[in-house]
Each structure stands twice: as C-alpha cells, then as structure tokens.
From Swiss-Prot:
Transmembrane segments: none annotated. Signal peptide: none annotated. This protein binds specifically to 23S rRNA; its binding is stimulated by other ribosomal proteins, e.g. L4, L17, and L20. It is important during the early stages of 50S assembly. It makes multiple contacts with different domains of the 23S rRNA in the assembled 50S subunit and ribosome. The globular domain of the protein is located near the polypeptide exit tunnel on the outside of the subunit, while an extended beta-hairpin is found that lines the wall of the exit tunnel in the center of the 70S ribosome. Part of the 50S ribosomal subunit. Keywords: Ribonucleoprotein, Ribosomal protein, RNA-binding, rRNA-binding. This is Large ribosomal subunit protein uL22. Belongs to the universal ribosomal protein uL22 family. GO terms for molecular function: rRNA binding; structural constituent of ribosome. InterPro entries: Ribosomal_uL22 (IPR001063), Ribosomal_uL22_bac/chlpt-type (IPR005727), Ribosomal_uL22_bac/org-type (IPR047867), Ribosomal_uL22_sf (IPR036394). One of its GO terms (cellular component) is cytosolic large ribosomal subunit.
Length: 136
C-alpha cells in the first residue's frame, strides 16, 4: 500500500471510531412511507425520538424504533457506558431505495398491470449533542 493511500485509510479508520450508526437493509416498506417516519425524528434527541416513534401509528415507526435502539447500543458499546438523557441526538438518517420486486396483475383484454413491491435501506447516525446544539 502506498504512503498516501495508507494515510487516507488511517484517517478513515479514525473517523469511523467517532461514528455511531446502525443500518437496516431490505425493509419491505416503500421508501416514500419510510421517509415520512425518518423526517419525524431527524435532528431530535434520541430518547425524545423513541417516544415519538413509540406513539406513532405508522408501521415503519416500529422498524425505525428498533434501528434507533441498535444505534444507541452501538454508541454505548464503543464508549463503554450508558447513554444519558439529553446526551445523544439523531445526527442524520437516510432512506435509500433497495430492490423492487416486479409482479403482474391480470387486467382486461389479456393485458397485465405491473405491481412494484418496493423496499428500502435505512441508515441512522447518532452523535453527541454539543453545547451550542442544546439550545434548540
């Protein structure tokens, strides 16, 4: 490995140590429906976000709640202590399209209508709240 490549790899590795995230792949929910739930908690303090997700009536909220609990556990594992209230926030959450299953539905006059069963990938990052962010 070259010197410049090694330096950039070490920098990436150091940056990875301070990132706390969880990924959820191939969720059988349409990305549009999942983004509604993701927009509800983006930038929120994690325990407040858990409360919002718990009382949301959307099906995707239960999946995102489980993902958020996993991200909090990842943070606790790396820092070797429990997260306190007001310490962590959802720094970013992204919902990307995954594979789409294509099915046919019988239609009049021998035709077939296409049914697209969409799925998505969700990536959630948590980060510590800094002093200036706590004013919000």
């Amino acid at each position: 490995m070259g010197a410049r490549k090694r330096i950039s790899a070490e920098a990436r590795k150091e940056a990875q140590k301070t990132m706390y995230f969880a990924k959820l792949n191939n969720v059988p929910t349409s990305p549009r429906k999942m983004r509604l739930v993701a927009d509800m908690i983006r930038g929120m303090e994690v325990f407040r976000a858990l409360g919002v997700l718990k009382f949301s009536n959307k099906e995707a909220a239960a999946r995102v709640e489980k993902l958020l609990r996993s991200a909090i556990a990842n943070w606790e594992q790396k820092n070797e202590r429990k997260a306190e209230a007001g310490e962590l926030c959802v720094s970013s959450i992204s919902v990307d399209c995954a594979t789409t299953l294509k099915r046919m539905r019988p239609a009049p006059q021998g035709r077939g209508y296409r049914i697209r069963k969409r799925s998505n990938h969700v990536t959630l990052f948590v980060d510590t709240l800094s002093k200036n962010d706590s004013q919000n």
